[in-house]
Amino acid sequence: MKQALLVVSFGTSVPRARQDIEAVERVLAAGAPERAFCRAYTSPTIRRILAERGEPVPGLPEALEALAAAGVEDVAVQPTHLLYGFEYDKLKADAAAFAGRFARLALGRPLAADSESLRALAACMVRRFGQPEGGALVLLGHGTEHFANMVYPAMQTALRLAGGRRAYMGTVEGWPGFDEVLAQLKEDGCGQALLVPFMLVAGDHALNDMAGDGPKSWKSRLEAAGVGVRCRMRGLGALPEVQALYGARLREIV
């Protein structure tokens, strides 16, 4: 039986950020060496930009269509998405449309799919980036209007339980937002902060919304509020601990 591993990411058009996706892909490919490896990106905008550069990456339906045409019978689809949400819902629907085209089509869970994974992520963040007295660790996620946004306040609790007394969870487009995080920093007397993307890659959001020089970036707004800021410009995909968590997700479906 011909088997394939299809790793599905939102994608990025930032060349350096793509390294973080590829690091996760390598771990996943090594975890299923008997399967032919292929990738797909779900963002139409990113796929268009990459195609214009001569670096095409298929969408999920196109990738599954190609696998079916090649006679593949067993496909393990592992997303690199961090949480359940609108993007995962669409991915799931797109995959379900091909269920009858394969003898077996299995879809993996996102990274932060349960409390155990949140605890592991929190422990990793505190261990790697926990700040000395007077400083703060601020994780910045994407955020969503989907109910799955509750992962972020849950992560705040997990950080504290992991020993991150001055570790804070914020989001670009969800809750907690900038105002909530700044209020906590002020209340706890934090004069310095390390901003770390809580995203697979340090792409557009990290470059602009987190660390950009414009007045609306988190870096600029924190500095305007009197908080000294350093930024880490690598995504979660660069961390071996996170790569291992993705590997565990894949083992659930192969």
Residue ranges of model-derived segments:
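Active-site-proximal alpha-helix that buttresses catalytic centers in soluble enzyme cores
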Residues: 1-254
